[in-house]
Amino acid sequence: MESLVDGDGFPDLEEDEDIDQFNDDTFGAGAVDDDWREEHERLAEMEEKLPATHILARVTSSPINDLLGDQQEELEQSLNQLVRENEEPALPQGSLTQFSAGMNSSIWDTSRTIRPIRGPLLMEDMTPLSILHEYGLATVAPPGRDDTERDASERALPRRSTSPVIGSPPVRAVPIGTPPKHGASPNFSHTQVLCPNPIHIRASSAFSGPHNNPASILRHPFPSALSPLQRAQLLGGAQTVAAQMSPSQFSRPGLHGPTLASVAPKLLQGHVGQMVAPVGGGFRPFFGVPSAPGAHIKNMSLRSQQQFRPDTTHLHPQHRRMLYQRQQNRNQHRGVNGSGGERTCRPAQMELNRRDPYAGLMLQREKEWVCRIQLLQLQSTDPYHDDYYYQNYFEKLDKLSVSQDRSREGPKKERTKLITPQVAKLEHTYKPVQFEGSLGKLTVSSVNNPRKMIDAVATSRSEEDETREKQVRDKKRQTLVIIEKMFSLLLDLEDFERRFSLCCEEAEHEVLTEEQKQKLQQLCDTLRGKEVGERVAEEQFVQIMCIRKGKRMISRILPLLPLQLAAAVLSIMAHNLLFLIKKDIQDQALPCLAATCSLVLCQLSLPALTSLLQNLCGATSQQQLSSILQNKFGLTLLYQILERGEDLLSSGDPMSQSQPTWTSLVVQAAHCLLQVSELSLPRPLCSPLTALAHFSRYLDTQNSSLLQSKLGSTNGTL
C-alpha cells in the first residue's frame, strides 16, 4: 500500500516510449491532435439547449435493446459537463455540481447533486465475486435503492467514434482519477482513494431484478470499441469529482451508492493495489458483494450451460418437454439467486444467444430429407416389439407427469404424442436363391433381411453315402493310429544300436537282441495285417503310403525288414505306383524312398527282379507306363531295377541267365522311353549309364543310339 501511495508501484511509467506506444495502441495514432476542449464546450452548449421534457421523453421512449442510442448521447453530454466542471480550478473543493430543475429526475437525483458515476463494464460477463478476487476490492454490500433512482450513468457509454470525450482523452500532467491534494475531514480520511493512476476494471454486465440485490451494477455494458484505458480514465474523472465532495454530502440519502475501488491497471503494473476498508457511512465499495460466496462459479457454470443449446429437433416430444422444463428450472433458480434479470433485461443479447451458429449450412430440402430419414426409423407397426424399453420408459414418465399435474391446481397440460406416418407393411416370406449342391452361398441382403447372408443348402443324402463316408473316416483314423504305432516301434528299433554300443556284458547283449527281435516282429505283423506268411496287407499299405508321414516311415523301415518282406513291400509299391504318384502331387515325398529301395534291390535275385519289373510294367498299359516314367521316382526305380539286372547278367552266374519274361519287359520299357518326349522326361536320382548298357543287349543299334542320345541329353550325365 505504501508503494502505491509513494508512486513506486508503477516503475514502467517512467519509460516514456512504453507509455507513448501504449497510448498509440489504445487510442490510435493522432488521437490527441484535435481540439478536444472545443468539442467539450460544444457538447456542453448542446446539453444546455435541450429542454428537460425532451430529455425525459427520449429516455422513457427509447427501447431497451438500443444500447448505443439516444440515452448514450445524453449520458455522454452529462459526462462532458462533469469533466469540464471538474477541470475548472475556480470551483471550490467542497462544492456540489448543480443542474437546472428541468433535467430528468431519472438521471439527476432529488437533491440536485451529482452522484458518483458507476464503473463501466466490459463485454465479457464477470460477477462481482470474481472482481473481488482479482482486484482485492472491499466486501461491504452497498445499500439498496429504488429502480426509479437508476440514472443514465448506468447505461452503456457510446463508441469512440461518436464520443470525442472518450475517444480523445485530455492531455494533462496528472492523470484523471488522481485523488485531490487538498485536505479532508477526519471522517473522510479513511476512505480516500489511494491509487494515483487510472484504473482498469472488469465488472458484471447485468443487474438483478430486485432493487436491493447487491450484485446489480449496470444495465448495459460499455461498447466494445472502448479500450480499457479509456474506461479507466472515465472512472478516474468520476473519482475526482467524488473525492472533492465533503463527507457530509455522502451521508445524504440521494448520494448513497457504491463508489469506485482503487485498482491499478494490469497493463502498467505487475501487482494489484488494495482498497482501504470503509468506515462508518463513508465510501462504499464501487462493486457490490455477491449474494453468496459461490455465486461467481455458479453463474459462470449456468451461463456456459445456457449457451450450449443442443439441437433437439429430431428428438421425441417427451425429450423436448424435459429439456424445456430443465431450462425453465434454471431460469427460475437464476432469478431467485439474484441473477435472473440478465436474460429478461437484455432481449437483444438473449436473441443473439439463441441464434443457431450452424444456421444456413443446410438447405430446406436437405433438412426435410433428414427429417424423413429419422421418421423412417420410427415407423413401426409393433413398437412394443421393436423398442420395448423405450416405450415403457416414456410410459412411466407420462404417468409420473400426470400424477404431478393432478396434485397441482390450474389448467391441465395436454400430453404431446409422437405421430408417425402410417405405412402399410406387407407380410412376405423371405426365399433366398437356392443353388443345388453348394455348401453355402451369398444372397442379396436388404434392410428387412440383413442377417440372412448365408443359407446352407440342405441336400438329401442316402444311407449308403453316409455309411461310405463314415467308413472312409474310420479307415483314415485307423491308418493314423497304425502309423503312430509303427513309428513308436521304429524309434525303439533305431535306439537298439545305441544300446548295443553301451552294452558290455554278453548276457545283457543277448537280452537286447531278443528284445529287438520282438520289436521287429511286432512291426512285421503290423505290416502284414491279417495276411498269412510273408505278404503285406495291400490296402493298409496303400493307405499308409497316401499319408506323407507314412511314406517317410516306410523309407526308414525298409532297411530293417527281412528281405522277403521288404521285396513284398517293393512289389506292392510298384503295382500301385501310378495311384501313389497321383496322391503324391502335393507332398512330393516319394523320392525319399529311392535310397532305401536301392539297398533292397541290391539283395534281390533275377526272378525277384523279374517279378518286380512285371508289377511295374507288365500289369499296366502303355499309357500308364508312360505316366510312371514321367515321374522322377518311377524313372529312378526303373533304372535301379535294370542296373541290378545288368549286374546279375555280367557276373556270369548260370542261375542268373536272362529269361524270356525279363527280355520282353526290358524291350517294352525301352520302346516306352522312346515314345516319351525329351521335355517330359524328368531328371532321375541315379545315373542311367548301367541301364543304357543293359538296354543295348536287347535293342538294335539304331534304337540303342536314339535311346542313348535321348537319355543322355535329358539327364546331362553323358
UniProtKB/Swiss-Prot annotation:
GO terms for biological process: deadenylation-dependent decapping of nuclear-transcribed mRNA; negative regulation of cytoplasmic mRNA processing body assembly; negative regulation of translation; P-body assembly. Residues 9-23 have a biased composition (Acidic residues). InterPro entries: Pat1-like, PAT1_dom. Residues 1-30, 139-188, 327-347 are annotated as: Disordered. GO terms for molecular function: G-quadruplex RNA binding; poly(G) binding; poly(U) RNA binding; RNA binding; translation repressor activity. The keyword Nucleus applies. Keywords: Cytoplasm, Nucleus, Phosphoprotein, RNA-binding. Its main location: cytoplasm. It holds the Pfam family PAT1. This is Protein PAT1 homolog 1. The gene is patl1.
